[in-house]
Amino acid sequence: MSDYTQQLQDKKDHLKTLFAGLDVPEWEVYESPDKHYRMRAEFRIWHEGGEMFYAMFEKGQKAGGASLIRCDRFEAASEAVNRLMPELIAVAAQSAELRNRWYAVEFLSTLSGEMLVTMIYHKRLDDEWMQAAQALQQQLDTSVIGRSRGQKIVLKQDYVTETLKVGNRDFRYRQIEGGFTQPNAAVCQKMLEWACGAAEGLGGDLLELYCGNGNFTLPLSEKFERVLATEISKTSVGAAQWNIEANGIGNIKIARLSAEEFTEAYTGKREFARLKDGGIALTDYAFSTIFVDPPRAGIDEETLKLVSQFDNIIYISCNPETLRANLDTLVETHVVERAALFDQFPFTHHIESGVLLKKKIL
């Protein structure tokens, strides 16, 4: 058994143990490539003896020489990131402006090889730095952002555009520097396919909480009459609106509300001008399904009460422990019809999963 297969088996075993006692069907398993799967990568820049190189540190240890791991290559990162890593450090090393007090770097890439590089400094970035960075950007044919305390200098653009294939259609996504995106694009496509399969035939309208940049929203919109999606981050809402327009989708509306705020609006406890200003009347919708992709903490108690009111629930989770806790409540009213493991993060303990629940027929 390969190292990859073994770690995936360990995750399956963990889920079976964690969800023991719940009536959960056989877990569908979606594998990742075993290398070059991460579209994002972050490194410290380590300066030593006149040389500088990419570095990480041993987990759980203080960053320093004793825990230092030199990273000339990083097999988990996309091939585009690995190609650019030696070129970037070689060019930057030739410029005092780029080299001096360069502290860290973040790479954001796409399946097509588009790249955004954020160079983080412990100094104020001035015109001389900008000139050197523009020359580097042109030489490497990439987009560069400079960051320092209180500074963000965008030389060309602060996003990449990813294209993900779901079924027979390509969806374009603007991914903003610093915004949340699924790091494993190959597995993300499998997650989108699974979610669309889970939604097949449900009909009616869809409510989505925690929609981010519209990652799931866009392909799911093809399975429902109308979609109302909520997200609290202004950056993510802006990206989602661009993504909706860029893909020519006309049945999605975005409300900039947290899950807790939407629960208050839906139950009539509070009125929000943001809904009215967006031309959103909750009474216009006939929701058959709710889609949730919450943060690691899972769904809060009040929102969970709201979720349990829907006939169909599609729940994507980045934390199986909080999913288990939420399911302990949801199985009082619903049955788990499908369950899936998505190996978004190979060779780590992190597990991404998804479940489809349908209301019990009493």
Swiss-Prot record:
SUPFAM superfamilies: S-adenosyl-L-methionine-dependent methyltransferases. The active site is at residues 318, 352. It comes from the Bacteria. GO terms for cellular component: cytosol. Keywords: Methyltransferase, S-adenosyl-L-methionine, Transferase, tRNA processing. InterPro entries: MeTrfase_TrmA_AS, SAM-dependent_MTases_sf, TrmA_MeTrfase, U5_MeTrfase_fam. It catalyses: uridine(54) in tRNA + S-adenosyl-L-methionine = 5-methyluridine(54) in tRNA + S-adenosyl-L-homocysteine + H(+); uridine(341) in tmRNA + S-adenosyl-L-methionine = 5-methyluridine(341) in tmRNA + S-adenosyl-L-homocysteine + H(+). S-adenosyl-L-methionine binds at residues 182, 210, 215, 231, 293. One of its GO terms (molecular function) is rRNA binding. One of its GO terms (biological process) is tRNA methylation. Its EC number is 2.1.1.-, 2.1.1.35. It holds the Pfam family tRNA_U5-meth_tr. Belongs to the class I-like SAM-binding methyltransferase superfamily. RNA M5U methyltransferase family. TrmA subfamily. HAMAP family: RNA_methyltr_TrmA. Dual-specificity methyltransferase that catalyzes the formation of 5-methyluridine at position 54 (m5U54) in all tRNAs, and that of position 341 (m5U341) in tmRNA (transfer-mRNA). This is tRNA/tmRNA (uracil-C(5))-methyltransferase. It comes from Neisseria meningitidis serogroup A / serotype 4A (strain DSM 15465 / Z2491).
